[in-house]
Amino acid sequence: LQEYLKSLGSVAVAFSSGVDSTFLLKAAYDALGDKVIALTARSCSFPERELQEAINFTKDLHVPHEIFDSEELKNKEFSENPANRCYICKREIFSKMKEIADKMGMKEVIEGSNIDDLGDYRPGLAAIEELGIKSPLRYAGLAKNEIRELSKDLGLETWDKQSFACLASRIPYGQRITEEKLKMVDEAEQLLLSMGFRQVRVRHHENLARIEINESQFPLIMKKETRELIYNRCREIGFIYVSLDLLGYRTGSMNETLDV
């Protein structure tokens, strides 16, 4: 990984503050020093807490950090929420990143997908490849568990951070994505996180919230006072019905409706 990064000369790292991109930014900084910048897209699909973590990490690492506004909701092609939504969004965001990187004299834009990402429906990867974005972690053959282990060795706090996907992934394909829906999802997930649930997804099915949490935490959510608090708060947020997914949290559950 280090040798490959050095061969790129200078890089702009697509940085979301997640496990993979944090490790990649640290590895790039170790390999290239001041020939690295971080780029983060600010969007209503990206919670403020994640943006703040990105800002804090780049400050600690002393890496220049450019934050730009992505306006995917203004793109009707995206907001109508087709099955290739991720492709549309990634194409727009990474096109902007390439423009910024070019203006700042960076030779390549790199991003943090790993080899495990090849096993799910990931239309966003097509946009990355079309635009010539480099994926060093995939090039090095690194899987998620290895990235976590290496992050721990490097002393990165994100080594055990829970996986996160953009808030738009909580809305079923074909149902329009709106700022209001994204805000409802964000508020409901913030509630669950504040109550001690570690891995959470609140899927937005119009007036119904479908909650996914790790099965190990089912006993906590089944307590009467916990259920009542979640129900009442979700009603205040705007949902009418609140349900628990009996299979628990799983990556890409919205893709279960697709024939891929």
What are these regions (language model features)?
Residues 245-252:
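A short, acidic, flexible beta-alpha connecting loop/helix-capping segment that sits on the rim
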Residues 111, 138-144, 148-192, 196-201:
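Mid-to-C-terminal catalytic subdomains of enzymes
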Residues 1-153, 194, 209, 225-239, ...:
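ATP-dependent adenylation/nucleotidyltransferase module used to activate substrates
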Residues 198-205, 245:
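C-terminal boundary motif of the adenylate-forming
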